[in-house]
């Protein structure tokens, strides 16, 4: 299982997330959630294969820029407890 408590933000300059054509409307809730899922899927896949998780930093930065902190904390708690509804 992934250790969601040990996640640290990547170093370097943070910028505004670029436009994502999958989410053209102003409402970015789905974009936030999808990037959260993509980040955890990326971590899971790359860790399992023994590869660097550095490419996953993009998703981390995007969901941390778009998602409210309370949502992220709630989702991480659900993952930790094994009750997260999303498919990771």
Curated annotation (Swiss-Prot):
Motif, Cx10C motif: chain positions: 56-67
Primary localization: mitochondrion
Disulfide bonds: 32-67, 42-56
Associated pathway: Energy metabolism; oxidative phosphorylation
Membrane topology type: Peripheral membrane protein
Span of domain CHCH: 29-75
CDD domains reported for this sequence: Cyt_c_Oxidase_VIb
Alphabetical list of PANTHER family matching this protein: CYTOCHROME C OXIDASE SUBUNIT 6B (PTHR11387)
Family of the protein in this entry: Belongs to the cytochrome c oxidase subunit 6B family.
Functional description taken from the UniProt entry: Component of the cytochrome c oxidase, the last enzyme in the mitochondrial electron transport chain which drives oxidative phosphorylation. The respiratory chain contains 3 multisubunit complexes succinate dehydrogenase (complex II, CII), ubiquinol-cytochrome c oxidoreductase (cytochrome b-c1 complex, complex III, CIII) and cytochrome c oxidase (complex IV, CIV), that cooperate to transfer electrons derived from NADH and succinate to molecular oxygen, creating an electrochemical gradient over the inner membrane that drives transmembrane transport and the ATP synthase.
Description of how the protein assembles with itself and partners: Component of the cytochrome c oxidase (complex IV, CIV), a multisubunit enzyme composed of 14 subunits. The complex is composed of a catalytic core of 3 subunits MT-CO1, MT-CO2 and MT-CO3, encoded in the mitochondrial DNA, and 11 supernumerary subunits COX4I1 (or COX4I2), COX5A, COX5B, COX6A1 (or COX6A2), COX6B1 (or COX6B2), COX6C, COX7A2 (or COX7A1), COX7B, COX7C, COX8A and NDUFA4, which are encoded in the nuclear genome.
Protein name from the UniProt record: Cytochrome c oxidase subunit 6B2
Organism encoding this protein: Homo sapiens
């Amino acid at each position: 299982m992934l250790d969601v408590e040990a996640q640290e933000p990547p170093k370097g300059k943070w910028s505004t997330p670029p436009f994502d054509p999958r989410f053209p409307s102003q409402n970015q809730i789905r974009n936030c959630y999808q990037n959260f899922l993509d980040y955890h899927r990326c971590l899971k896949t790359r860790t399992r294969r023994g590869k660097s998780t550095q490419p996953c930093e993009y998703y981390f930065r995007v969901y941390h820029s778009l998602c409210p902190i309370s949502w992220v904390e709630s989702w991480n708690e659900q993952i930790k407890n094994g009750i997260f509804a999303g498919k990771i």
